[in-house]
Amino acid sequence: MKTKQSEFDIVIVGAGLSGIGAAYRLQNNCPTLNYTILEGRSAIGGTWNLFTYPGVRSDSDMYTFGFPFSPWKNPKVIADGPDILNYIKDTADKFDITKKIQFDRRVISSSWSSKNKKWTLKIGNNITKSVEHIKCRFLYMCSGYYNYKEGYTPDFPNIDSFSGKIIHPQHWDHKLDYTNKKIVIIGSGATAVTLLPILAEKAKLVTMLQRSPTYILNLPSEDVVANFLKRILPAIIAHRISRWKNILFNLAFYNACQKWPKTLKKFLKNRIKKSLGNKYVDKHFDPKYGPWDQRLCAVPDNDLFETIKNGKAEIVTETIKTFNKKGILLDSEKQLEADIIITATGLKVQMFGGMELLKDDKKIDVSNQHAFKGVMLSDVPNFFVAIGYTNASWTLKCDLNAQYVTKILNYLKINNFTVCVPEFDHENIKTERLLNFDAGYILRANKFLPKQGDKSPWKVYQNYIRDLFSLKYGKASNEYLKYK
């Protein structure tokens, strides 16, 4: 979008799922406010525009991962990346959001002025290489939680000695020909289990090398109940029923994992044993932690297990001693020969797309701030952030956040306030890490993530029903949220 406008009521940063969802809530609930969306890339979609590796797909069902106001019409509920990208684009077009997006605009810094009660954004234009400035009363960060420029790769010994190709899935080489090649995928998360079946269709052998096992749940790629409802009900009604069905099921399953971890662990292992047998599962699918202590991976239609069963792929559970010319030497002295090594070793967590945050020309250390309802940060005025769930679809929480943000904006307008800022009670509320989650990328990031408190409204509960009443149906007024 080409515009000379340099001041807005609100600026949304990021044109992915959470950014488009925030824009919809904003223009529906606060129609008098003018806004723009700044997107650092040249296209809409966020994650789903960036990740293009073979087989990329959601690891959540699309009824909870997608927009509640835009029906998911595809019969596949565990959806392919290109279909998700088209869904985001179509939704943005349908609700006239696309025209509000300024592409190729990377926010370098955002500085709050207490005197002017406004944010000033310093923006890098990727096309002209020039620096632009925009002012706004409110800033809403929907830029995700990881570094788009590079993924995380551990410091593997002698990695440069390998004579073949090394690829991180975040930046896939589409010219890569892996036909009849030996491929080693390092990792056991969602990306690794997604890549394995699709690569095995052409490769000679695909080996998934994992340091330790992960919980994996087989799910049907199509939701039979949802597809039936689509045939007999209006699309939006069928979508809402299917969404609530899956929200409640996923929440019940998560709570069951927390309450009866041994029983649910046995249940998950037994489902895999039907395909791979006891010995294979006990060695490669027996995590040392409880179900949902880390994110549980979903695979559609048994594709991972069937590929292994058919001999086109294998799992090796060992640790790396060193890379060498032929591949990887394990600590057991076993050699894994490879033509291609894929480092599906995770993300680099990054807050606000690397943007510098300032208040009255002083840099704000985000790690010293506390998250208010997972929507705002303590002592940072007129600043909102989309923080999602780690135990469910990330975007479920982002949509509730957006609805609460619009409540705050309307409360400000009705009461003739211009500023809102959360103030943390250091004397009576204890500090905890923001995400009580043991995934590697979260543990690496704790040192620069904001904190949470040990009680409401400073505690992030990871519970949709609780957040529904707190955010969608809760009041904008709060003793810790100061309006001026």
Task: Give residue spans per PLM region.
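Short beta-strand to alpha-helix junction loop
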Residues: 72-90, 102, 186, 256-264, ...
